């Protein structure tokens, strides 16, 4: 790649997308790097059962918690990030 950018944003979710939108109003050359691709346009996208019940787009990887126990995080790698699946809603803890 021979192109040069002023800024690189990692991820296009809520944070990265907001930063990219704000910076798009400047003269900066911006590159967004996303781990996943676009979610396919298909009927299953509109089915809560397919998306949530069958976890159609959920990543298959496993993580380890602080005790070293394996768990399957509810995460997605796609353009728009997890925000696409959470409807841009973030709950306070």
Predicted ranges, named:
Residues 1-93:
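N-terminal glycine-rich phosphate/pyrophosphate-binding loop and immediately adjacent elements
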């Amino acid at each position: 790649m021979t192109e040069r950018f002023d800024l690189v944003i990692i991820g296009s979710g809520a944070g990265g997308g907001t930063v990219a939108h704000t910076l798009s109003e400047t003269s900066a050359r911006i590159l967004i790097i996303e781990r996943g691709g676009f979610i396919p346009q298909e009927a299953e996208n509109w089915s809560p059962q397919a998306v949530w019940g069958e976890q159609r787009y959920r990543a298959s990887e496993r993580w380890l918690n602080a005790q070293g126990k394996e768990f399957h995080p509810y995460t997605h790698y796609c353009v728009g990030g997890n925000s696409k699946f959470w409807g841009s809603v973030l709950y306070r803890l």
